[in-house]
Design a protein with these regions (language model features):
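Cross-family detector of peptidyl-prolyl cis-trans isomerase
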Residues: 2-157
Length: 157
């Protein structure tokens, strides 16, 4: 009798374990939400403007208020891509905005983020000399790469 009870319990444990594995497997197949940049203004610039430093930008969505200063810390959502379209970094992947001091990022970000107001969105084409230069970032950004960013400035902290 004891042996039959143990076998019955083992059978139920096997069924429960299999059911749990199936549920977890199904949950792994469900696509997680993908966060992407918000909408651009209908009248957003289609052409890039180039600054004297070589940074190219276009305002995709106007914000309100004063833009950040080079010494400010900002909260942003962003995606960074190489010229071939491959994504090398993104806050959208985690669904959590990032915080950066503009004095601690590549020069192209420091300059570019000062051109957009909170609530706004900007597209930046950062030449190598304002990005990671001739060295790049091993395993992520090739030497001499132009960096392409879409950045939503959520707020100045």
């Amino acid at each position: 009798m004891l042996a039959q009870g143990m076998l019955a319990r083992r059978g139920w444990l096997a069924v429960a374990g299999g059911l749990a594995a199936a549920i977890l497997g199904f949950a792994g197949c469900v696509q997680q939400p993908t966060f992407r940049p918000g909408p651009a203004d209908p009248d957003a610039a289609s052409e890039f403007t180039q600054t004297p430093s070589g940074l190219r930008y276009r305002i995709l969505r106007k914000g309100e208020g004063d833009p950040p200063k080079a010494s400010d810390t900002v909260r942003v959502h962003y995606v960074g891509k190489l010229d071939d379209g491959s994504e090398f970094d993104s806050s959208y992947r985690t669904g959590k905005p990032a915080e950066f001091s503009l004095s601690g990022v590549v020069k192209g970000w420091t300059e570019g983020l000062q051109l957009v107001q909170p609530g706004g969105m900007i597209e930046l084409q950062v030449p190598p000399e304002l990005g990671y230069g001739r060295d790049g970032v091993p395993g992520a950004i090739p030497p001499g790469a132009t960096l392409n960013f879409t950045v939503e400035l959520i707020e100045i902290l």
